[in-house]
Amino acid sequence: FPGADTFAGEQLHAHSYVDNSIFDGRRSVILGMGNSAMDIAVESSYVAQRTYLAGRSGVWILPKYVFGKPVDQMRNDPRVPFAVRQRFIQAMIRSYVGPPERYGLPKPRHRFGQAHPTISGRILDRIQHGTITPKPNIESLDATSVRFVDGSSVEADIVVYCTGYQISFPFFDEDFLSAPDNHIELFRRVFHPQIPNVFFIGLLQPLGAIMPIAEAQGAWVGDYLIGDYRLPSEAELVADIAADQAAMRRRYVSSKRHTIQVDFDDYLHALSKERAAGAQRARENGFKPPVECLPSAATAAS
C-alpha cells in the first residue's frame, strides 16, 4: 500500500504471527476476512487498546458449532445436487447468524459455496461488544496511521496482513516444478501426470479438516506403491484434470485461493470411487507395483 514504507509501527504477515502478546496495549489493524484474519483479530481484541478488522471483500461466516455439532460434521450428501445444498446452507446461515453486513462487515458478492467461507465462533460476538471495529480495505499508510478506502483513518501501532499464501516448492528447481499464481495441475490433487512417483499429500483447501483427507490420500498412495491401485493413462489424467479445473472455474470466484479448493464430502466420495476403479485396473495388470523392487546389495555379516 502507498506509504507502507513510512509507517513507524510494526507490520507483519499472518505467517509470522505467534501469539497476541504483540498487541498488548497497542492499536492494531488486521487486514483480511479469512480464518487467520478473524482468529487474530479476536485474539487481539482481548489485549489491544483498539482492534480494527479491515475487509477487502465480503465472506460468509459460519459458526463453529451448529445443532451441537462441529459445522464441518454436518451431513453434506454429495448425491444431492450442489445448487440444492447451496440454497439450504445459505438460508441456514442467514437464519442462524444473520447477514454479515448487519455487523458492519462487507456484504459477500457471491452465493455461499462460491468462495471459501470463514469459520469463527467469536468474531461476531466481539464485534457486537465493540472490541473489534470493522473497516473497509486499506487505502494507504503514513507514519502513525492507516487510511481506509471510505476516507476514514485510525491511529495504529501494528498492522497484520492476512492476505493469503503463495504455493512454492523451494526444494525443486522451478523448471522442474512450480505453481505460478498458485496453479498446479494434479489428478485428484495428488498425482502429477508428467512426473511419476512424486505425490502431493494435503496440498488442498477443504471446508473442514485437512487431516482426514490427507489420511485418505496417503492410503491411496500406499495402494499405488504396492500395486493395488493403477492410475489411468496419461491422456486420461490430463483430460480429467482439465475437466476438474473447468468445473472449479465455474464453481468458485476467481482467486488464487481457490486453485486448490475442494468440497470435503464430495472429494472423499470421488476419491473412493476412483480407488475402486484403479483397483480394477491393477487387477487387470496383475497387481504390478509402479516401481521395480530390487534385491538389496547388502550381505549378511559373517
Where are the regions that the model predicts?
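PP2C/PPM-type serine/threonine phosphatase catalytic domain
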Residues: 73-76
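Flavin (primarily FAD) cofactor-binding/catalytic cores of flavoenzymes
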Residues: 1-65, 78-234, 249-302
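Short low-complexity, flexible loop/linker segments enriched in glycine and/or proline
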Residues: 67-70
